[in-house]
């Protein structure tokens, strides 16, 4: 079985070798852990973001920069294609580990989750486990993790602190923005899973999403980065569905973000109206704008949802002069 942490460790090695070119900073903590700053104190950028995205996906996807037409504006975008969608996106990329140690908080994603089984129920559902001597994690945070954070991660992953490797970037950074848009395929799979679809039948996934500019602080950028997927994220999945075509159509109909009661305005406005409480925001909103599925069993293709660039332009706050 593929080891996501082994795959991720190869990406980390590349990041260490190319740190100067990536405009990142490598930090060695006293307990031996390796931290790669991709946008907190370091400048980072598009290439650092690409490496972050590769790391999140355990290098099990083909990633390319592209462009997206936002009502006549050619906007930077990222394409994701994978033939290991469940392992790449759910066993690795999914941001399923809330890490809170003292005054430190970050959202953990990437390979190390598979060692810590974060969350355990998901790994049981997809039948995946990893066994590797190093833990490779991507952290979305505005602070660099210290020794106490590393010790917490090492304990949960059953590895030595010196074998913990963390790449970190804040939401309000170019690298952070890139890796969030690269979650476009994963958000669709997660939405499928949340409505009772057997995600193990998903054989491949492709997606494209614009990359948000820096519009403000981390909370404001959380809005614009999510909007990239919610309003202009497009995904295609190949599945081998055991069931009637009508049942598959019903699943596909329920996946796009357009089905959410909170759909229709920039996410920051929705989040602010909910007093910045995620639990008051409809979770169904976190999905691609348009989803297309090709079923290998029925030899049919189904599509649902649509793209809404005008809302994304509002979210970005673009001023034409």
Swiss-Prot record:
Entry's localization field: Cytoplasm
GO biological process, one term: methanogenesis, from carbon dioxide
Record-listed E.C. numbers: 3.5.4.27
Reaction catalysis annotation: 5,10-methenyl-5,6,7,8-tetrahydromethanopterin + H2O = N(5)-formyl-5,6,7,8-tetrahydromethanopterin + H(+)
UniProt keyword list: Cytoplasm, Hydrolase, Methanogenesis, One-carbon metabolism
Molecular functions (GO terms): methenyltetrahydromethanopterin cyclohydrolase activity
GO CC terms of this entry: cytoplasm
Pathway in which this enzyme or protein is active: One-carbon metabolism; methanogenesis from CO(2); 5,10-methenyl-5,6,7,8-tetrahydromethanopterin from CO(2): step 3/3
InterPro entries: METHMP_CycHdrlase
Function field: Catalyzes the reversible interconversion of 5-formyl-H(4)MPT to methenyl-H(4)MPT(+).
Entry similarity comment: Belongs to the MCH family.
Protein name per its UniProtKB record: Methenyltetrahydromethanopterin cyclohydrolase
Species name: Methanosarcina mazei (strain ATCC BAA-159 / DSM 3647 / Goe1 / Go1 / JCM 11833 / OCM 88) (Methanosarcina frisia)
């Amino acid at each position: 079985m593929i080891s996501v942490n082994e795959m991720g460790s190869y990406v980390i090695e590349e990041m260490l070798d190319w740190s100067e070119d990536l405009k990142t900073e490598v930090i060695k903590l006293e307990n031996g852990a390796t931290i790669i700053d991709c946008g907190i104190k370091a400048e980072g950028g598009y290439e650092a973001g690409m490496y972050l995205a590769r790391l999140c996906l355990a290098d099990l996807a083909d990633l390319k920069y592209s462009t997206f037409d936002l009502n006549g504006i050619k906007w930077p975008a990222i394409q994701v294609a994978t033939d290991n969608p469940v392992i790449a996106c759910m066993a690795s990329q999914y941001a399923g580990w809330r890490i809170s140690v003292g005054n430190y908080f970050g959202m953990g994603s990437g390979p190390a989750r598979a060692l810590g089984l974060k969350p355990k129920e998901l790994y049981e559902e997809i039948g995946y486990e990893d066994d590797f001597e190093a833990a490779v994690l991507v952290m979305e945070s505005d602070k660099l993790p210290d020794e106490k954070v590393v010790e917490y991660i090492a304990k949960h992953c059953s590895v030595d602190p010196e074998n913990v490797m963390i790449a970190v970037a804040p939401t309000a950074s170019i690298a952070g923005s890139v890796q969030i848009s690269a979650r476009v395929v994963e958000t669709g799979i997660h939405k499928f899973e949340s409505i009772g679809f057997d995600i193990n039948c998903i054989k491949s996934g492709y997606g494209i999403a614009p990359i948000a500019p820096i519009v403000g602080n981390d909370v404001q950028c959380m809005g614009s980065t999510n909007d990239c997927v919610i309003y202009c994220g497009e995904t295609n999945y190949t599945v081998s569905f055991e069931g009637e075509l009508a049942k598959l159509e019903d699943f596909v109909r329920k996946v796009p973000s357009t089905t959410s009661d909170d759909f229709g305005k920039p996410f920051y406005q929705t989040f602010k109206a909910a007093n910045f409480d995620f639990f008051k925001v409809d979770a169904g909103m976190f999905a691609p704008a348009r989803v297309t599925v090709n079923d290998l069993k029925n030899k049919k293709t189904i599509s649902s949802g649509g793209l809404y660039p005008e809302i994304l332009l509002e979210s970005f706050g673009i001023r034409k002069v």
